[in-house]
Amino acid sequence: MPVIKVRENESFDVALRRFKRSCEKAGLLAEVRAREFYEKPTTIRKREKASLAKRHAKRNFRENARNTRLY
């Protein structure tokens, strides 16, 4: 849990903004969304495998585009 200390003469808005930024860096919102509903282990594996395939396809596309001459 991110903790911030409110500095002297710091407005509430600035402190709230710093807290939100620290929560975002810690990945709290993503974690809450991921744990909101139960996800079966097979579904998790399937989603991760699809993500891996997408990453590889994107990398291959970039490598091929880099080697292709446009003239």
From Swiss-Prot:
GO terms for cellular component: ribonucleoprotein complex; ribosome. Residues 60-71 have a biased composition (Basic and acidic residues). Transmembrane segments: none annotated. InterPro entries: Ribosomal_bS21, Ribosomal_bS21_CS, Ribosomal_bS21_sf. Signal peptide: none annotated. Keywords: Ribonucleoprotein, Ribosomal protein. One of its GO terms (molecular function) is structural constituent of ribosome. Residues 48-59 have a biased composition (Basic residues). One of its GO terms (biological process) is translation. Residues 48-71 are annotated as: Disordered. Coiled coil: none annotated. It holds the Pfam family Ribosomal_S21. Belongs to the bacterial ribosomal protein bS21 family. This is Small ribosomal subunit protein bS21. It comes from Glaesserella parasuis serovar 5 (strain SH0165).
